[in-house]
Swiss-Prot record:
NCBIfam families: minE, PRK00296.1. GO terms for biological process: cell division; regulation of division septum assembly. Prevents the cell division inhibition by proteins MinC and MinD at internal division sites while permitting inhibition at polar sites. This ensures cell division at the proper site by restricting the formation of a division septum at the midpoint of the long axis of the cell. Keywords: Cell cycle, Cell division. Belongs to the MinE family. InterPro entries: MinE, MinE_sf. This is Cell division topological specificity factor. It comes from Synechococcus sp. (strain RCC307).
Protein backbone atom coordinates (compact mmCIF):
# COMPACT_ATOMS: atom_id res chain seq x y z
CA UNK A 1 0.00 0.00 0.00
CA UNK A 2 1.43 3.36 -0.97
CA UNK A 3 1.52 6.34 1.36
CA UNK A 4 -1.14 8.07 -0.75
CA UNK A 5 -3.44 5.03 -0.53
CA UNK A 6 -2.95 4.90 3.25
CA UNK A 7 -3.80 8.61 3.63
CA UNK A 8 -6.85 8.23 1.39
CA UNK A 9 -8.03 5.25 3.45
CA UNK A 10 -7.56 7.13 6.75
CA UNK A 11 -9.50 10.12 5.41
CA UNK A 12 -12.25 7.91 4.03
CA UNK A 13 -11.69 8.86 0.41
CA UNK A 14 -12.95 6.52 -2.28
CA UNK A 15 -10.51 5.10 -4.81
CA UNK A 16 -11.05 5.88 -8.46
CA UNK A 17 -12.35 2.93 -10.45
CA UNK A 18 -9.17 2.98 -12.58
CA UNK A 19 -7.03 2.63 -9.45
CA UNK A 20 -9.19 -0.22 -8.19
CA UNK A 21 -9.02 -1.98 -11.55
CA UNK A 22 -5.24 -1.54 -11.67
CA UNK A 23 -4.87 -3.00 -8.17
CA UNK A 24 -7.05 -5.99 -9.06
CA UNK A 25 -5.06 -6.63 -12.24
CA UNK A 26 -1.80 -6.46 -10.29
CA UNK A 27 -3.21 -8.97 -7.81
CA UNK A 28 -4.23 -11.36 -10.59
CA UNK A 29 -0.80 -11.05 -12.22
CA UNK A 30 0.96 -11.63 -8.90
CA UNK A 31 -1.03 -14.81 -8.26
CA UNK A 32 -0.39 -15.98 -11.82
CA UNK A 33 3.36 -15.29 -11.67
CA UNK A 34 3.75 -16.91 -8.26
CA UNK A 35 2.16 -20.12 -9.53
CA UNK A 36 0.37 -20.57 -6.17
CA UNK A 37 -3.00 -22.22 -6.33
CA UNK A 38 -5.79 -20.66 -4.21
CA UNK A 39 -5.81 -23.56 -1.71
CA UNK A 40 -2.09 -23.18 -1.03
CA UNK A 41 -2.47 -19.41 -0.68
CA UNK A 42 -5.29 -19.90 1.84
CA UNK A 43 -3.22 -22.42 3.82
CA UNK A 44 -0.29 -19.97 3.92
CA UNK A 45 -2.62 -17.19 5.10
CA UNK A 46 -4.00 -19.35 7.92
CA UNK A 47 -0.53 -20.42 9.07
CA UNK A 48 0.81 -16.85 9.01
CA UNK A 49 -2.17 -15.68 11.09
CA UNK A 50 -1.66 -18.54 13.58
CA UNK A 51 2.01 -17.69 14.11
CA UNK A 52 1.51 -13.93 14.43
CA UNK A 53 -1.50 -14.49 16.72
CA UNK A 54 0.75 -16.33 19.19
CA UNK A 55 2.57 -13.05 19.89
CA UNK A 56 -0.09 -10.37 19.40
CA UNK A 57 -3.88 -10.20 19.43
CA UNK A 58 -5.02 -9.42 15.89
CA UNK A 59 -8.09 -7.69 14.49
CA UNK A 60 -8.87 -10.43 11.96
CA UNK A 61 -11.74 -8.46 10.38
CA UNK A 62 -9.40 -5.69 9.24
CA UNK A 63 -6.51 -7.91 8.20
CA UNK A 64 -5.38 -8.95 4.77
CA UNK A 65 -2.70 -11.25 3.36
CA UNK A 66 -2.09 -10.90 -0.35
CA UNK A 67 0.42 -11.01 -3.15
CA UNK A 68 1.45 -7.70 -4.66
CA UNK A 69 3.59 -6.98 -7.70
CA UNK A 70 5.64 -3.86 -8.27
CA UNK A 71 7.73 -3.73 -11.40
CA UNK A 72 9.22 -7.24 -11.63
CA UNK A 73 9.06 -8.27 -7.97
CA UNK A 74 6.22 -10.16 -6.30
CA UNK A 75 5.82 -9.82 -2.53
CA UNK A 76 3.65 -11.54 0.04
CA UNK A 77 2.15 -8.66 2.02
CA UNK A 78 0.43 -9.07 5.38
CA UNK A 79 -1.58 -6.09 6.62
CA UNK A 80 -2.56 -7.22 10.11
CA UNK A 81 -4.03 -4.66 12.55
CA UNK A 82 -2.77 -5.39 16.07
CA UNK A 83 -5.18 -4.95 19.00
CA UNK A 84 -2.55 -5.54 21.68
CA UNK A 85 0.72 -7.32 22.39
CA UNK A 86 0.28 -10.51 24.41
CA UNK A 87 1.91 -10.69 27.85
CA UNK A 88 2.78 -14.35 27.32
CA UNK A 89 3.46 -16.10 24.03
CA UNK A 90 0.79 -18.71 23.29
CA UNK A 91 2.01 -22.29 22.82
CA UNK A 92 2.50 -23.53 19.29
CA UNK A 93 -0.39 -25.61 18.00
CA UNK A 94 0.62 -28.56 15.77
CA UNK A 95 -0.38 -27.97 12.17
CA UNK A 96 -3.24 -30.05 10.84
CA UNK A 97 -2.41 -31.48 7.43
Amino acid sequence: MTLREMIDRLLGRQQASATTAKHRLQLVLAHDRSDLNPDLMEQMRREILEVVNRYVELDLEGGDVSLETEERATALVANLPIRRVRDDVLPQVPAVQ
